[in-house]
Amino acid sequence: MVMFKKIKSFEVVFNDPEKVYGSGEKVAGRVIVEVCEVTRVKAVRILACGVAKVLWMQGSQQCKQTLDYLRYEDTLLLEEQPTAGENEMVIMRPGNKYEYKFGFELPQGPLGTSFKGKYGCVDYWVKAFLDRPSQPTQEAKKNFEVMDLVDVNTPDLMAPVSAKKEKKVSCMFIPDGRVSVSARIDRKGFCEGDDISIHADFENTCSRIVVPKAAIVARHTYLANGQTKVFTQKLSSVRGNHIISGTCASWRGKSLRVQKIRPSILGCNILKVEYSLLIYVSVPGSKKVILDLPLVIGSRSGLSSRTSSMASRTSSEMSWIDLNIPDTPEAPPCYMDIIPEDHRLESPTTPLLDDVDDSQDSPIFMYAPEFQFMPPPTYTEVDPCVLNNNNNNNNVQ
């Protein structure tokens, strides 16, 4: 019977554990080995990988696809490697710490940003292998983060984005006016911590009370075997005051902050992470009027964008101090562990934007308070007329 020798510790350690790497940068670290007893080691190897993969079930069919970004293999040596003669094995003894250094460069060009979603991920890791004669190979694995640069200061992403939409409202096939919304944001590209300054105009000519709102929404698109899977998350939102029938409302620099989220992933062929600013009007008893303004979340923010963001935030706070009633901000994605389950939807966008309190603060029609009648008298099974007749008879007798 072969007795397996235990290893006290076997781990991969990076020189800068907190660093987020970019294309062309060097990843360096060491593999640390400690033993409990004298051990002969044939080799210490590493394998570095970066891969995007998607996987989900479409009925009985498995949709699966992978895309490699990185693959690097090497056999490591000690700086002063003690050997056991001809076979060149390393003799490791208890009480000593053996360190094998490694280093490699990430490929130049676009790399997928590290990401973990419901149906796919982009992972980068280093795996170490400890080969011993007559013993099973021992493995140790360590992940590291990679972020592909997305510069939001390009002319395309600094250009304003605008849209407008109008919807006819009806009740029992009878026309009931219109609801219209037009909106504009100063630019398309933002970074974590930036404030989106929203300029919008709303008009309500229907008989219902409507509520204007805005939300940042993430869309994760997975592609495999010719099939597409879309997963939507509502990240943060803000709302305005009710708009009664026959009136208008405007937002002039209403602010919505970009929470802690991953940059957009647009260059991957099997996995995309896209963001949108949805400006919409909740119309009770009818579909929402929704404007979809595309956003690009970047990894680099310039001074000009940050300055304009702060300026818009200040003006918005001064102008809307009495009117801005924001929703409680929700946790941003890492995605799968911190997004509430009720905001993880694979259905269309409209159910995603439904709010629990719509039925309470958005009556369908404007109406006068209902008249309350007096309650009926207390019911009794004893006829008071019979009691009165009996009392009168007793008095006569």
UniProtKB/Swiss-Prot annotation:
Q: Give the CC-aspect GO terms.
A: cytoplasm; cytosol
Q: Which GO terms describe its molecular function?
A: enzyme inhibitor activity; ubiquitin protein ligase binding
- Tell whether Cell division is among the UniProt keywords: no
**Which compartments is it annotated to reside in?**
Cytoplasm
Indicate yes or no for the key word S-adenosyl-L-methionine.
no
How does inactivating the gene affect the organism? Marked reduction in the numbers of natural killer cells, low levels of Il2rb expression in the precursor hematopoietic stem cells and severe lymphoid hyperplasia in the small intestine.
Q: Which residues carry this modification: Phosphoserine?
A: S362
Q: How is it modified after translation?
A: Ubiquitinated; undergoes heterotypic 'Lys-48'-/'Lys-63'-branched polyubiquitination catalyzed by ITCH and UBR5 resulting in proteasomal degradation. Deubiquitinated by USP5, leading to TXNIP stabilization.
GO BP terms in the entry: cellular response to tumor cell; keratinocyte differentiation; negative regulation of cell division; negative regulation of transcription by RNA polymerase II; platelet-derived growth factor receptor signaling pathway; positive regulation of apoptotic process; protein import into nucleus; regulation of cell population proliferation
Pfam families linked to this entry: Arrestin_C (PF02752), Arrestin_N (PF00339)
Covalent cross-link Glycyl lysine isopeptide (Lys-Gly) (interchain with G-Cter in ubiquitin) as placed by the record, residue numbers = K213
Signal sequence annotation: none
Give the matching SUPFAM superfamilies. E set domains
According to UniProt, the tissues expressing it are described as:
Ubiquitously expressed.
Q: Which of UniProt's keywords are assigned here?
A: Cell cycle, Cytoplasm, Disulfide bond, Isopeptide bond, Phosphoprotein, Transcription, Transcription regulation, Tumor suppressor, Ubl conjugation
The family assignment reads: Belongs to the arrestin family.
Q: What does this protein do?
A: May act as an oxidative stress mediator by inhibiting thioredoxin activity or by limiting its bioavailability. Interacts with COPS5 and restores COPS5-induced suppression of CDKN1B stability, blocking the COPS5-mediated translocation of CDKN1B from the nucleus to the cytoplasm. Functions as a transcriptional repressor, possibly by acting as a bridge molecule between transcription factors and corepressor complexes, and over-expression will induce G0/G1 cell cycle arrest. Required for the maturation of natural killer cells. Acts as a suppressor of tumor cell growth.
Name of the protein: Thioredoxin-interacting protein
